[in-house]
């Protein structure tokens, strides 16, 4: 811009300012009322975390059903476990043959490979030795629950085909109204006073509980899991003298006096003691010369008609809620140590369990030992003992 242009611009500005100064002042106006101060915005509530099982729950509910097998409602508090699961997720339960043994469960899968109806089990709860054999035969499928890392490595398949659920030790459940002198150890059961009173909880050719009872007696008499002949000889003698009752013992047969001395897992016997509430009076004895602990395992059938419901069932069982429901039934849930470490076991539940020193002598047979024991007993029970348990 030239100096002349700058000069003219300045003159014009001065002229405008002079005229403005001569104009009358505008009437004063009131300041507008201040708008009310808005309350500071509250931070939005954090969104509830998404349920990591939401998709599985939806898929399971779409299937609508779950078929179980060999889950007596008076075993390990399974009645409450089943009802809680069904009510929580709205899934109908089809409960097959509650009194079946582990071998029967495996046969049910084999017999219903092509059956998507109500006779085909979705899930099984079997003795430890049955898990690996079922995997080898292609009868079960892998699935790792959310709490997988808190299940001890020694009782689970690394690929997730089967995993331990709970354990207990073998005990005598004795109806004191029918038995005057309560037996305290394995040798006592051969005494003449117990004629027609002693029973197993299943057929030793198919029942894991009965097989381990023979293993316990074998150890008490100098045998081994690999060679439990001493256990078979013991039952052969018991059968010979008439003390053995070839009836599958149940709570009802104990109460009626048909099998007043029965060999059960401690958690079943303790549960019966509470349930009978003195009518009849039940005494639970853990024989000191052969304390055998047994672990059961869960698995999903490779042919499950309701695979998502089966997976949700597993998630429920291995959640804190499911594990504590089992504890109410006197079993030691497989995640017990994790629950205890986090302080989530209610005091009243902990106090109901037998003293820990009772379990100090407990022997946990390895998978290989259980497999050897099962094979020996299944092959030799009939020819050595000769009793048809049913």
Where would I find each of the regions flagged by the language model?
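Short, low-complexity disordered leader/linker segments with a strong preference
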Residues: 1-63, 389-390
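Conserved C-terminal helix/tail region of periplasmic/extracytoplasmic solute-binding proteins
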Residues: 40, 47-48, 252, 356-390
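Signal peptide-proximal N-terminal region
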Residues: 58-59, 86-94
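Extracytoplasmic ligand-binding site segments that recognize negatively charged/polar headgroups
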Residues: 67-83, 94-110, 117-258
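Short amphipathic alpha-helical coupling segments at ligand-binding clamshell hinges
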Residues: 81, 91, 185, 227-234, ...
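A ligand-binding cleft/hinge motif common to bilobed small-molecule-binding domains
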Residues: 131-133, 260-280
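Periplasmic-binding protein-like
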Residues: 167-170, 232-237, 243, 277-302
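Mature extracytoplasmic/periplasmic domains
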Residues: 292, 296, 301-362
């Amino acid at each position: 811009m030239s100096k002349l242009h700058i000069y003219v611009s300045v003159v014009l500005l001065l002229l405008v300012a002079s005229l403005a100064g001569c104009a009358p002042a505008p009437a004063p106006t009131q300041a507008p009322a201040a708008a009310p101060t808005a309350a500071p915005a509250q931070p939005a509530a954090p969104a509830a975390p998404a349920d990591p099982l939401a998709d599985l729950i939806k898929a399971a509910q779409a299937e609508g059903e779950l078929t179980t097998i060999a889950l007596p409602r008076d075993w390990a508090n399974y009645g409450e476990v089943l009802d809680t699961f069904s009510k929580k997720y709205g899934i109908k339960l089809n409960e097959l043959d509650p009194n079946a043994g582990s071998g029967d469960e495996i046969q049910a899968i084999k017999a219903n490979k092509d059956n998507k109806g109500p006779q085909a089990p979705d899930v099984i709860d079997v003795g430890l030795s049955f898990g690996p054999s079922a995997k080898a035969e292609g009868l079960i499928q892998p699935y790792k629950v959310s709490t997988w890392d808190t299940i001890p490595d020694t009782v689970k398949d690394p690929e997730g085909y089967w995993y331990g659920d709970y354990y207990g030790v073998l005990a005598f459940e004795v109806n004191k109204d029918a038995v005057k002198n309560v037996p305290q150890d394995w040798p006592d059961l051969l005494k003449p006073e117990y004629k027609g009173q002693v029973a197993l909880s299943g057929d030793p050719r198919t029942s894991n509980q009965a097989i381990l009872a023979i293993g316990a007696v074998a150890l008490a008499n100098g045998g081994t899991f690999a060679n439990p002949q001493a256990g078979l000889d013991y039952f052969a003698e018991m059968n010979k003298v008439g003390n053995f009752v070839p009836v599958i013992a149940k709570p009802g047969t104990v109460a009626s006096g048909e099998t007043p001395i029965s060999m059960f897992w401690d958690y079943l016997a303790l549960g019966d003691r509470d349930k009978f509430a003195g009518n009849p009076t039940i005494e639970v004895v853990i024989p000191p010369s052969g304390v055998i602990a047994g672990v059961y395992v869960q698995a999903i059938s490779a042919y499950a008609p309701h695979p998502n419901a089966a997976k949700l069932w597993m998630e429920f069982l291995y959640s804190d809620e499911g594990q504590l429901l089992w504890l109410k039934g006197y079993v030691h849930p497989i995640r017990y140590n994790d629950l205890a470490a986090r302080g989530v076991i209610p005091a009243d539940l902990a106090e109901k369990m037998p003293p820990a020193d009772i379990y100090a002598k407990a022997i946990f047979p390895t998978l290989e030992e259980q497999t050897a024991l099962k094979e020996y007993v299944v092959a030799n029970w009939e020819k050595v003992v000769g009793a048809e348990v049913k």
